[in-house]
Amino acid sequence: MSGPLVLAVPSKGRLQENAEAFFGRAGLNLSKPGGARDYRGTISGLDNVEIAYLSASDIASQLARGTVHLGVTGEDLVREEITDADKRVLLIDTLGFGGANVVVAVPQAWIDVRTMADLDDVASGFRAQHNRRMRVATKYINLTRGFFASHGIVDYRIVESAGATEGAPAVGTAELIVDITSTGSTLVANGLKVLDDGVILRSQANLVASRDADWSEGPRESARIILDHIHARARASKYREVRTRFKGCDAAMLTEAHNRFGVVAPFGGPTSSGMLTLHCPPAQIYSLGSFLRAHGAETVSVASLDYVLDRENPLFARLEAFLRS
């Protein structure tokens, strides 16, 4: 008998709150039967799923080892921690929170340094003048090496940062940094600026699957159910349901509504009594309502959608294709 599917989520702070809220909106309610300090949890109604509460960096490591099936973590940690990440894990879906950029930042006093090409010139001149390589403080060692290599920069050495990376140039432990930032305000406060082409990665929280986990029948079915919930919620959030009834509706009018307002008719054209159900992007609701009334509709009602369940689930299809490849 196969073991449970293990879903790893961040164990503290805003990331944990956002992850739990994300799953909750999809009808997947995470709970800790052992209390708030427990590092194991469950999903209500899914017996074959175990929640593991880990740090975001540990989640990336456990995905690489295959000890968890699915995990919520930042793409920056996936790319940094996992060698050949695209072969070993699948970024199933972005989750809409935890957004931040991994960037190259230099002192604002370096007024002539705006690009990576400028930095390459500075690096060469720095070594000639000081007889040592320029120091780059960072926690993102692998991302830094790859990005600098792509720009042909070799005259530098990495100083691994264990604390507040943005303070390294000010205290003299590095000339520049590679760090993650969401607004850039902390960098500015420390006298730093991001190079014009210095964004290494635009990261956010992702739902990630491990190739090396045990994907036997039980965990695979649990993953299908979880991804079905997530896709149904995501699909619903893109639309509002519009209902109306009038005799003047025909295929040409539906085609025009689709082309102008992006609507879909999930149940086909109007019924024999003229009832019509459409799914419409929220920003187009008023325009669609005006269009329908102009064509003879007396009343148009609009309702929010909780879930839209399709026969096919592209998220699970992506996972299946990845595991077969």
UniProtKB/Swiss-Prot annotation:
Disulfide bonds: none annotated. InterPro entries: ATP-PRT_HisG_long (IPR020621), ATP_PRibTrfase_cat (IPR013820), ATP_PRibTrfase_CS (IPR018198), ATP_PRibTrfase_HisG (IPR001348). Keywords: Amino-acid biosynthesis, ATP-binding, Cytoplasm, Glycosyltransferase, Histidine biosynthesis, Magnesium, Metal-binding, Nucleotide-binding, Transferase. Belongs to the ATP phosphoribosyltransferase family. Long subfamily. One of its GO terms (molecular function) is ATP binding. It is found in: Cytoplasm. Feedback inhibited by histidine. GO terms for biological process: L-histidine biosynthetic process. HAMAP family: HisG_Long. GO terms for cellular component: cytoplasm. It catalyses: 1-(5-phospho-beta-D-ribosyl)-ATP + diphosphate = 5-phospho-alpha-D-ribose 1-diphosphate + ATP. Pathway: Amino-acid biosynthesis; L-histidine biosynthesis; L-histidine from 5-phospho-alpha-D-ribose 1-diphosphate: step 1/9. The keyword NAD does not apply. It comes from Bradyrhizobium sp. (strain ORS 278). The gene is hisG. This is ATP phosphoribosyltransferase. Its cofactor is Mg(2+).
